[in-house]
Every structure is written in structure tokens, then in C-alpha cells.
């Protein structure tokens, strides 16, 4: 059964910090024959939570940007903070990024109800999404270990969990071989998607103090139904 939240936006798929490059415009006939570089569409999802989709700046503000997306989704009419204000409030910095505890504390101090825990399973993740609850995940940013990280060998300090990244899981599609999950990724233009197997492999991170967060997620249980992606504010 399909369950959807809001109006879906056709979007692109990219992995953290990947940019899609295209050639300059050519003849109209040639353009019409080129297929968009999408790996899927949000309309394919069984469940999709439509949230504001914002871009991070720099290489360390992914957590801050995810928090801003959540706050704008929960209260779009009072979303007058910019990313710098969130960065200061969360204590985000280039060395540590935004630790999980800082995000949870910020939500609690701002009366946003959350459930934060480790060792979540993908069926539990799908269940949260089905209830209309987006989930912040700390993962490894890249799809392949060749991109500079490993999730197994803790003796290799240079690569072990070296590419931590925050994303928001906003939807899923149940397929014969498992789930496909959809994400707001602050390092990407548009939405992203990832297979259940790939997510399980990458769903782990470590903070600067050496604390490992395995299958950690911050489930937003507060109500975000007031957000309307097609709504327009009067420019006063």
C-alpha cells in the first residue's frame, strides 16, 4: 500500500558531494534524445516524506543543515534562522562537525520530540518512515571503501570511519531483493537513494573522541504536517 506525505518533487540521485556535469546545450533534436541521469523517482517510493531540501556549505556542516531542514519542516512559518545561527547553537566546527549528542540536545531544548538510539534495523527504519517520522542517520559518505574509509579495520586510524556524514532518511520502496531508501542529503542537489545492503554497510560512524555509532538514528516523532512544498509566502 502506498503512503505519501506532501507533494513529491522529481529529483536527482547523487552520493555525498558528487556533482552532475553536463555538456553545453546542443541542437534540440539531440537534447530530446538524452535521458536524464536519474536512478529513480520519488514517485516510485511506497512512503515518502516531503521535507525542505537544503544544501550544506563547506565539508563539515552536514549535521547543521540536516537540523535546519527538520526545523523548517516542523515550523515553516517561524523558520527565520539561517545556517550560521544553527551552526553556532549546535557548536558545529571543522574538526568535530556536529556530534549526535549536540543534535539531540538541541531538539530537546527546542521541544522537538525525538527517539535516538543505536542498532536500528532497516525494518525499524521503514516502520518509522511509515509513521511519518524522518530519521537522521550518521553514515559513511561514500559508496566504496576506495574513496577513503573502511568500516572494519580499526587499526588503520587514517581510514577507519573517516568519512562521516549526516543525512535524513525520508522514504522507502519495498522491492523483491529488499528496501531502497530515499534521503535528503545536504551534499547533493535533489534527493538521493541507497539500497538496503549499501545502507547497512555504511550505517556507522565515529566521533572525534572515538565513540562509534553503529546503525544510529535520530527519529523525529514530532508532527511536521504543516509543511507545504507548494506553499508561497508573501515577500514583505
Regions found by a protein language model. Give the residues of each.
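Solvent-exposed loop/turn segments at secondary-structure junctions
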Residues: 57-61, 68-69, 91-95, 114, ...
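Sec-dependent signal peptide cleavage junction
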Residues: 19-37
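Active-site nucleophile-adjacent alpha helix/oxyanion-hole segment immediately C-terminal to the catalytic cysteine
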Residues: 34-92
Amino acid at each position: 500500500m502506498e503512503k505519501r506525505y506532501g507533494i513529491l518533487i522529481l529529483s536527482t540521485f547523487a552520493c555525498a558531494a558528487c556533482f552532475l556535469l553536463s555538456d553545453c546545450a546542443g541542437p534540440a533534436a539531440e537534447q530530446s534524445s538524452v535521458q536524464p541521469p536519474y536512478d529513480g523517482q520519488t514517485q516510485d517510493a511506497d512512503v515518502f516524506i516531503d521535507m525542505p531540501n537544503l544544501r550544506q556549505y563547506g565539508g563539515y556542516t552536514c549535521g547543521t543543515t540536516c537540523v535546519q531542514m527538520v526545523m523548517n519542516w516542523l515550523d515553516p512559518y517561524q523558520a527565520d534562522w539561517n545556517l550560521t545561527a544553527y551552526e553556532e547553537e549546535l557548536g558545529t566546527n571543522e574538526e568535530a562537525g556536529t556530534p549526535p549528542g549536540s543534535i539531540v540536545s538541541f531538539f530537546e531544548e527546542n521541544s522537538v520530540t525525538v527517539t535516538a538510539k543505536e542498532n536500528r534495523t532497516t525494518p525499524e527504519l521503514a516502520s518509522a518512515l511509515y509513521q511519518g517520522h524522518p530519521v537522521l542517520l550518521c553514515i559513511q559518505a561514500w559508496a566504496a571503501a576506495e574513496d577513503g574509509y573502511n568500516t572494519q579495520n580499526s587499526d588503520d586510524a587514517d581510514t577507519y570511519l573517516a568519512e562521516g556524514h549526516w543525512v535524513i532518511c525520508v522514504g522507502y520502496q519495498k522491492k523483491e531483493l529488499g528496501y531502497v531508501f530515499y534521503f535528503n542529503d545536504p551534499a547533493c542537489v535533489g534527493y538521493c537513494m541507497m539500497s538496503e545492503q549499501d545502507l547497512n554497510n555504511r550505517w556507522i560512524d565515529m566521533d572525534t573522541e572515538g565513540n562509534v555509532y553503529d546503525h544510529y538514528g535520530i527519529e523525529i516523532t514530532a508532527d511536521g504536517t504543516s509543511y507545504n512544498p507548494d506553499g508561497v509566502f508573501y515577500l514583505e
